[in-house]
Amino acid sequence: MKFIDEARIEVIAGDGGNGSASMRREKFVPFGGPDGGDGGRGGSVWAVADRNINTLIDYRFAKKHLARNGENGRGADCYGAAGDDITLRMPVGTAIYDADTEELIADLTIDGQRLCLAQGGEGGWGNIHFKSSTNRAPRQKTDGKAGERRNLRLELKVLADVGLLGMPNAGKSTLITAISNARPKIADYPFTTLHPNLGVVRTGPSKSFVVADIPGLIEGAAEGAGLGHQFLRHLQRTRVLLHVVDLAPFDESVDPVAEAKAIVGELKKYDAELFDKPRWLVLNKLDMVPEDEREARVKDFVKRFKWKGPVHRISALTHDGTQALVHAIQEYLDELRAEEDAAAAAPDQRLDPTLHNVDHDDQA
């Protein structure tokens, strides 16, 4: 299925039903009084995050979503039925924006998370509400209120722990195939990957992490060149980026260092926060470098690239070095989660009563 990561839709909640201005008319009841019921509430439009859905393609074609109107009230104290709500199921990771103001309405990050996108209109009042000691036969009633309608922009940002970053044909798809259950298209030409691929990497019975492979970047991606700029947003939720570099390009005129610097430059131009994310260097295709030249090739790259962070040497094709990379990632993610758990368990110092005790003698 084609990956669709953005869509625009219109949601229209149902109008409330009108109240009734009916009078009770029965044999032997000459002054029956008002018996007009209220109108029913209009149906609302809801969104719910569903982990079994991984695309917004349904909303690319179905752009208008309407809930039912509430029914009108009737005589004999009959209230109108409420309009049925409708629920729009969206992938986990969908950000919902107001298309007119670009205000972020919600971020669906948890499976089952539920949100009202458009509230149904309230039903109108029947004339039974207007009866008083001075007005025994009221003819007043109110109409139902209109339901909300909104133009929305849906944007899907995949939820992954690790993001793969690199030039086209750097071997990212081969790497995600080697370490995970993902099976993207692989070929020996650039731009094989046309949409993000997610893979689950299992490192133990109860341990795993998710890797995202996005289309390769080229210079000028931040301004819209190539395909990768459309998907850079998917890296914003990751915890660590793997910068995959082809250390043995077929075209000998291509300088891997210059390409790596171009990628870093695109990151910086696109989003400073993304640029500051933890980033590891993964030097790929070492199987294409003669064994006696590998050490010198790696040292030369690291020196010219002026890289100070973690470096992993791998061959995604032969799986050489991939297991060490996987275990290093899992260890890093475990440490991050342990730190987050410790921070969440720490008491809030603002609520510690001992911090608010004041020694009045010292103040004197």
UniProtKB/Swiss-Prot annotation:
It is found in: Cytoplasm. GO terms for biological process: ribosome biogenesis. It holds the Pfam family GTP1_OBG. Residues 1-159 form the Obg domain. Its EC number is 3.6.5.-. Residues 128-147, 340-364 are annotated as: Disordered. Residues 349-364 have a biased composition (Basic and acidic residues). Its cofactor is Mg(2+). It comes from the Bacteria. Keywords: Cytoplasm, GTP-binding, Hydrolase, Magnesium, Metal-binding, Nucleotide-binding. Belongs to the TRAFAC class OBG-HflX-like GTPase superfamily. OBG GTPase family. This is GTPase Obg. The lineage of its organism: Bacteria, Pseudomonadati, Pseudomonadota, Betaproteobacteria, Burkholderiales.
